[in-house]
Swiss-Prot record:
Entry-annotated residues carrying N6-(pyridoxal phosphate)lysine: K206
Cofactor dependency: pyridoxal 5'-phosphate
UniProt entry tagged with the keyword Coiled coil: no
Position of the signal peptide: none
Family: Belongs to the class-II pyridoxal-phosphate-dependent aminotransferase family. Histidinol-phosphate aminotransferase subfamily.
EC annotation from Swiss-Prot or TrEMBL: 2.6.1.9
Assembly mode: Homodimer.
Name of the protein: Histidinol-phosphate aminotransferase
Record CDD domains: AAT_like
Pathway of action: Amino-acid biosynthesis; L-histidine biosynthesis; L-histidine from 5-phospho-alpha-D-ribose 1-diphosphate: step 7/9
C-alpha cells in the first residue's frame, strides 16, 4: 500500500476540520449547556447529538469485535461511499475500478465527484479475477470497489481473489458487506489489522431492519477513520437515529431470529420459484434476495406491478438480461408473489 498521505487529496490532508461545540466538549459530566446556541426548552430534541456517536460506537465495537476508533458512522452507507471519493480522489485526475454489475451508487458518487469510473465485467458465474481488476488500474487509481455478497447478483465473491487484490493493489480496497449477515462467509472485519488498505462497509438497513433510520458503518484503520471524521458534516447522524440504533443493539437477539427466518424463507421461495414456467434460472445467492432469469423481465415486472407486487427489474444492467431481483419477504408476501406468478401466462 502507498503511504496514506500520498493517497489522500493534498487539501484534505492539510484540512483543519470544523470544530463544533460538542466536539470541544470532552464528555465530562455537565448539566448546563450554553455553548451551541440551542433552544434551552426541552422538546426533547432541542440539543445537538454527539457528533462522534460515542455511545453507539461503544456498543457496536464488541458486537463486531473491533476497536471503537476503527468505526465511522454515516447517514447511510452512501455517505461513506461519497466520503472515500472526497477524501482520496482528485476530481478530473484520479480514477476508481469496480466490478460490474454491482451496486449503482459507486458510479453515481464517482460521477458526482468527477472521478473516472472503470468497470471490469464479472465472469459467467458472477465472479471476478484480481488480475483483471489490477490490469484496469494505473498510477491514478485510488480505490477499488467490491461488494460481497454482491448486489444485484447475490453471491459471495471468491475470497482468495479478494485477498490477492488486497495484497497487491497499492491503493484502498472497499469491501461492501451490506448483506454479510445473511452469509456464512467470514467478514473481512477480522482482517483490518492485516490489511491497512482495507475499508469495510456494513449497514443497519438489511438484517437489522432499520432502513428508515439511514445508518451506515465503515470500518478501517484509525488513520483512515480520522480522515473521514475530518471531512464529515458536524452532526451527520441525528439523535433520533442514534437512539433507535442503540435500542436495536440492545435487541440484537431479534436480528438473529429475523435472519434465521429469512434464510428459511429464501430456501422455500427459491425452490418454488424455480418450478414456475416463467423462470429459466435462479442464480446462487448468499443474501436476502435472489436473481432470477425469466422469460420476459419487463413484461413480468409490469404484470406484478398490476398485482401490487414490486420486484426489481435488472434487465438493463450488464450480464442481467431478463433478470428480476427478488427480495425475500414474509411468508404471506412470498406466497402472494408465487400465487401471482403461477397465474401468469408466459
Amino acid at each position: 500500500m502507498k503511504d496514506l498521505k500520498e493517497l489522500t487529496r493534498p487539501n484534505i490532508w492539510a484540512l483543519k476540520p470544523y470544530s463544533s461545540a460538542r466536539d470541544e466538549y470532552n464528555g465530562a459530566e455537565a448539566s448546563v449547556f450554553l455553548d451551541a446556541n440551542e433552544n434551552p426548552y426541552n422538546t426533547p430534541n432541542n440539543r445537538y447529538p454527539d457528533p462522534m456517536q460515542r455511545e453507539l460506537k461503544n456498543m457496536i465495537a464488541p458486537i463486531k469485535k473491533v476497536d471503537p476508533d476503527t468505526i465511522f458512522l454515516g447517514n447511510g452507507s452512501d455517505e461513506a461511499i461519497d466520503l472515500v471519493y472526497r477524501a482520496f480522489c482528485i476530481p478530473g485526475v484520479d480514477n476508481v475500478v469496480a466490478i460490474d454489475p454491482t451496486y449503482g451508487m459507486y458510479q453515481v458518487c464517482a460521477d458526482v465527484n468527477d472521478v473516472e469510473y472503470r468497470k471490469v465485467l464479472l465472469d459467467e458465474n458472477y465472479q471476478f479475477s484480481a488480475d483483471k481488476l489490477l490490469a484496469a488500474t494505473d498510477d491514478h487509481t485510488k480505490l477499488v470497489f467490491l461488494c460481497s455478497p454482491n448486489n444485484p447478483t447475490g453471491n459471495n465473491l471468491d475470497r482468495r481473489e479478494m485477498e490477492k487484490l488486497l495484497d497487491t493493489f497499492q491503493g484502498l480496497v472497499i469491501i461492501d458487506e451490506a448483506y454479510s449477515d445473511f452469509s456464512d462467509a467470514p467478514s473481512f472485519l477480522a482482517d483490518l489489522d492485516k490489511y491497512p488498505n482495507l475499508i469495510v462497509f456494513q449497514t443497519f438497513s438489511k438484517a437489522w431492519g432499520c432502513a428508515a433510520i439511514r445508518l451506515g458503518m465503515a470500518f478501517a484503520s484509525k488513520e483512515i477513520i480520522s480522515i473521514f471524521s475530518k471531512i464529515k458534516y458536524p452532526y451527520n447522524v441525528n439523535l433520533l437515529t442514534q437512539k433507535e440504533a442503540v435500542m436495536m443493539l440492545h435487541r440484537h437477539y431479534e436480528v438473529e431470529r429475523w435472519v434465521k427466518s429469512l434464510l428459511e424463507e429464501r430456501t422455500r421461495l427459491v425452490n418454488e420459484f424455480v418450478e414456475l414456467p416463467c423462470c429459466e434460472k435462479i442464480y446462487p445467492t448468499d443474501a436476502n434476495f435472489f436473481l432470477a432469469k425469466v422469460t420476459d423481465a419487463k413484461k413480468i415486472y409490469n404484470y406484478l406491478v398490476g398485482k401490487g407486487i414490486i420486484v426489481r427489474n435488472r434487465t438493463s444492467i450488464s450480464l442481467c438480461r431478463d433478470c428480476l431481483r427478488v427480495t425475500i419477504g414474509t411468508r404471506p408476501e412470498n406466497d402472494m408473489l408465487l400465487e401471482a406468478l403461477k397465474n401468469y401466462e408466459c
